[in-house]
């Protein structure tokens, strides 16, 4: 696989080329064919995704409802789409190692049930696992089926808060794949041209870095609500909303912190 800088191509075209190697058409076709006939395990095998969970054990430990929700998600999981969108690192575009990424959360009944998460894991950097991905369940400490006293074999077994694919189902769930275009801001982006001049009113994005700034407030609201830190509708740039701060990563050494404010009820309804 060529490095991202070997041929002098742009960053965008380089990442597209990386994915052509990492998720070839043959993988997409095989995984899709298996998924469409209900063979989610076969789809995972075609996309080189290992399954480290047992639905019968899930039903016994967390209840039938949790197992049914998990089964429905697995039936609609597009493992090739998941592989396409997982975080990668330069210069060779390999999967970022040692990650545990949440895909979905379930809440079994019972006072001590806790939360159960479907997660995707990438192998540690030292493991001879190639570019394989694994699916597993993570139950928080103190919950039924939670981690035991022994160290977990994965270096970072807890879901990583930096990569919330449970809030971005369009990156792995075939039922939500159509949401990619509006969630990425493409619906209001001029075809083949630069972003609209009014999309960055605060002037926070460096020149030449095309970002869908007009989506930041809405995406921040989704994240803040999921973490229980939102109290209203996000939509402003001014300071003053306690707990409404969000950091946006613009590059390896560049971040901007935004603080959102709720839109007044009268304005939000107009």
Give each language-model segment a name:
Residues 1-220, 224-225, 234, 238:
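N-terminal membrane-targeting/anchoring modules of bacterial envelope and secretion proteins
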Residues 232, 236, 249-270:
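C-terminal structured domains
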Residues 244:
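DNA-recognition helix of helix-turn-helix
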């Amino acid at each position: 696989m060529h490095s991202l800088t070997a041929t002098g191509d742009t960053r965008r075209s380089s990442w597209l080329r990386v994915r052509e190697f990492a998720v070839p058409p043959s993988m997409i076709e095989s995984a899709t064919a298996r998924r469409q006939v209900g063979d989610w395990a076969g789809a995972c095998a075609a996309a080189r995704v290992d399954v480290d969970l047992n639905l019968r054990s899930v039903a016994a430990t967390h209840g039938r409802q949790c197992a049914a929700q998990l089964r429905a998600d697995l039936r609609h999981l597009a493992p090739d789409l998941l592989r396409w969108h997982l975080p990668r690192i330069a210069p060779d575009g390999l999967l970022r190692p040692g990650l545990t990424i949440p895909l979905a959360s379930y809440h079994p009944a019972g006072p001590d049930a806790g939360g159960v998460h479907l997660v995707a894991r990438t192998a540690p950097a030292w493991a001879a696992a190639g570019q394989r991905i694994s699916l597993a369940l993570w139950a928080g400490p103190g919950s039924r089926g939670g981690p035991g006293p022994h160290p977990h074999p994965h270096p970072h077994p807890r879901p990583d808060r930096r990569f919330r694919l449970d809030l971005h189902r369009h990156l792995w769930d075939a039922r939500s794949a159509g949401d990619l275009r509006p969630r990425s801001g493409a619906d209001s982006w001029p075809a083949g041209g630069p972003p609209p001049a009014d999309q960055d009113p605060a002037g926070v994005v460096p020149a030449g870095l095309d970002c869908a700034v007009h989506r930041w407030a809405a995406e921040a609201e989704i994240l803040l609500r999921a973490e229980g830190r939102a109290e209203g509708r996000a939509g402003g740039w001014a300071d003053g909303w306690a707990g409404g701060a969000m950091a946006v990563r613009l590059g390896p050494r560049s971040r901007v912190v935004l603080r959102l404010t709720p839109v007044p009820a009268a304005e939000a309804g107009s």
